[in-house]
């Protein structure tokens, strides 16, 4: 077994001492329960949000399709983000909630597993892919939509323990 690559002087773990990109060796880490929650929004025109809520768009049920896309995105994260480990996810939940007071859809994704590395990237990817799917399905009526505030909300497990966004 090789030793995990040490972090660089500035704490980055995906580079070796020569500055080359590496996938971190997690073989020596303990398996723990790990959960990550990420969130984000798709801001849009009021008429676009109304069409989503009323299922009035030609491409179909935007929220259901985006929910499935987010789940698929979490599962495909290591295919999209080069240094992510392939993980045996035990849970992926994606929620899309219309927010008419702010003309947006709020997206939340929760990913979980028992393993040696966290699921933050999977949760973030789920939110991003769900948001991109909302955009794709609505772009014919609103090209000015914006994906905003994609961020990690919380994570538990692993050596660093629990973290919650302030």
Curated annotation (Swiss-Prot):
Signal peptide segment: none
InterPro entries xrefs: MoaC, MoaC_bact/euk, MoaC_sf, MoCo_biosynth_MoaA/MoaC, Mopterin_CF_biosynth-C_dom
Pathway entry: Cofactor biosynthesis; molybdopterin biosynthesis
Catalytically driven reaction(s): (8S)-3',8-cyclo-7,8-dihydroguanosine 5'-triphosphate = cyclic pyranopterin phosphate + diphosphate
EC supergroup of this enzyme: lyase
Binding site for substrate: 83-85, 121-122
Disulfide bonds: none
Gene Ontology MF terms: cyclic pyranopterin monophosphate synthase activity
Similarity comment text for this entry: Belongs to the MoaC family.
Reported function: Catalyzes the conversion of (8S)-3',8-cyclo-7,8-dihydroguanosine 5'-triphosphate to cyclic pyranopterin monophosphate (cPMP).
Subunit structure, interactors included: Homohexamer; trimer of dimers.
PANTHER family noted in UniProt: CYCLIC PYRANOPTERIN MONOPHOSPHATE SYNTHASE (PTHR22960:SF29), MOLYBDOPTERIN COFACTOR SYNTHESIS PROTEIN A (PTHR22960)
The protein's name in its UniProt record: Cyclic pyranopterin monophosphate synthase
Organism (species): Rhodospirillum rubrum (strain ATCC 11170 / ATH 1.1.1 / DSM 467 / LMG 4362 / NCIMB 8255 / S1)
Name of encoding gene: moaC
């Amino acid at each position: 077994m090789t030793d995990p690559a040490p972090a660089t002087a500035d704490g980055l773990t995906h580079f070796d001492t020569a500055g080359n990109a590496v996938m971190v060796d997690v073989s020596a880490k303990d398996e723990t329960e790990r959960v990550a929650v990420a969130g984000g929004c798709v801001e849009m025109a009021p008429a676009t949000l109304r069409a989503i809520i009323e299922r009035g768009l030609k491409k179909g049920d935007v929220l259901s399709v985006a929910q499935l896309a987010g789940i698929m995105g979490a599962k495909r994260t290591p295919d999209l983000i080069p240094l992510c480990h392939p993980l045996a996810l035990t849970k992926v939940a994606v929620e899309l909630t219309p927010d008419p007071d702010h003309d947006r859809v709020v997206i939340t994704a929760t990913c979980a597993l028992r393993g040696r590395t966290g699921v933050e990237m999977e949760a973030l990817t789920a939110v991003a892919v769900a948001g991109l799917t909302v955009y794709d399905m609505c772009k014919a009526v609103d090209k000015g939509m914006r994906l905003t505030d994609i961020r990690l909300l919380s994570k538990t497990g692993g050596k660093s323990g629990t973290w919650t966004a302030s």
